[in-house]
Amino acid sequence: MAAKEIRFSDDARQRMMSGVNQLANAVKVTLGPRGRNAVLEKSFGAPTVTKDGVSVAKEIELEDHFENMGAQMLKEVSSQTSDVAGDGTTTATVLAQAILREGMKSLAAGMSPMELKKGIEKATEAASNYLSDELSKPCEDDNSIAQVGTISANSDEAVGRIIADAMGKVGKEGVITVEEGSGLDNELDVVEGMQFDRGYLSPYFVTDQQTMKAELEDAAILLHDKKISNIRDLLPLLEGVAKQNRPLLIIAEEVEGEALATLVVNNLRGIVKVAAVKAPGFGDRRKAMLQDIAILTGGTVISDEVGMTLENATVDDLGTAKKVQISKEETTIVGGAGRHDDIMARVEQIRAQMEESTSDYDKEKLQERVAKLVGGVAVIKVGAATEVEMKEKKARVEDALHATRAAVEEGIVPGGGTALIRALAALEGLSGANEEQTQGIALVRRAMEEPLRQLVLNAGEDASVVVNKVREGTGNHGYNVATGEYGDLVQAGVLDPTKVTRSALQNAASVAALMLTTEAMVADLPKKDDEGGGGDMGGMGGMGGMGGMM
């Protein structure tokens, strides 16, 4: 085990603070509509130009181990805020640095870090409650959603508008994904209904030769969790569907051999219009998705587990959909005939699974299933002229998407750092059990001005003048950094999601309090180069004598 270096109390905290300052100073220049760019070197290819705080923070590793620990702890603030709310990372970094800076002054004056921590926690709780209960307004209309997206995407109105369109089309439960597009403009693709990535098992099922798609109107849908290889099992169902003159979609683990050949022949002769696809997913997820399709279409999964066999199945066990579209790669079911109550019960069941799940991957897949049942899936294709611009723009669109989700969830507050200034009202008259706790409350009060100060500094204005003017106002009155004017920020469309502002404050206070109560730091000793490390090879000169061995 390598030898360690240990630093204690003030020495440890000062080194940590140095690392915090280096990271925070690099990140905070990107804050706001008039924030500056940061340029990140890449090991190959062109450097990345970004105004995204998290991207800058992720790149920073410091040489000094103790400074690096401070920087990494501050990084945790932005990544936690990003995980919970999807945005507000730069604000959280600015707040944490400010709380820590003010706290270090109090520690230098001989105050107890534990009492300061209690004061910080008390102030944070009061301010967070004020944000959620007093300031927050619901965000429901398209206009508010577009404004939140615009602000989060660094004042890019096109991004805000496309996110609002996507949410309008797939609903608040719908899944919206961001991909790299092929053109210069942003595009929105919306898939309504249930889509899964399995295509037709034979090109002979195609009904439209130009698009190479199979389209079935008012289709009956057979769901089976086993392989189908014997056509005799299917005959009763095929006859029943043919009598009703309806097309049939078969979704099974596999359709092969004689069964597939017979279906193709029947389809080509026009006896019964049919198409077959493999069931989506694998293992337990496949069973769950088949059940989702059954509930969506009002059908039943033919499965041994519930004592049903294919030869005993009737037309009543089949699901129904207004339209089914099948391409080589995917199948889309639109207008399933399932009962609304059954679908909503299934959605609640999946949501309960999401609450219990600890895996982000599982949660994402469960959320996709909810979207396919109730909303749909929208894909925003980001357009840009160059690879560098594409990456930067995609990161901004993803940020904006997270922010709008947070706004829909918990509501909105006036943006531009104004919400935190208004939340200072919650700290008026608030005092701790002793003087040191009261000082903890005071340093949070000072730190809550910092995001507005930084926004104004980045815009090249006088921060103190603006902060005082904003404090004199009430409600949504604040400073619009983009235009340089004072006014009602909600009307001007300068909004922040409540969840983002609240999470930024809570995470910043949590990590700053942790750092202030740090009393010892342990790190690996810097590796020393062995002096004269190459000198040992000198002895090899004697090998010249080996010539005598010939």
Curated annotation (Swiss-Prot):
SUPFAM superfamilies per UniProt: GroEL apical domain-like (SSF52029), GroEL equatorial domain-like (SSF48592), GroEL-intermediate domain like (SSF54849)
Stored InterPro entries: Chaperonin_Cpn60_CS (IPR018370), Cpn60/GroEL (IPR001844), Cpn60/GroEL/TCP-1 (IPR002423), GroEL-like_apical_dom_sf (IPR027409), GROEL-like_equatorial_sf (IPR027413), TCP-1-like_intermed_sf (IPR027410)
Source organism superkingdom: Bacteria
Keyword entries, A-Z: ATP-binding, Chaperone, Cytoplasm, Isomerase, Nucleotide-binding
Assigned GO CC terms: cytoplasm
Pfam entry (one): Cpn60_TCP1
Record EC number: 5.6.1.7
UniProt binding sites for ATP: 30-33, 51, 87-91, 416, 480-482, 496
Xref: CDD domains: GroEL
Region feature Disordered, mapped onto this chain: 525-550
Biased composition (Gly residues): 534-550
PANTHER family assigned to the protein according to its UniProt record, in alphabetical order: 60 KDA HEAT SHOCK PROTEIN, MITOCHONDRIAL
Function: Together with its co-chaperonin GroES, plays an essential role in assisting protein folding. The GroEL-GroES system forms a nano-cage that allows encapsulation of the non-native substrate proteins and provides a physical environment optimized to promote and accelerate protein folding.
Family: Belongs to the chaperonin (HSP60) family.
Protein name: Chaperonin GroEL
Organism of this sequence: Halorhodospira halophila (strain DSM 244 / SL1)
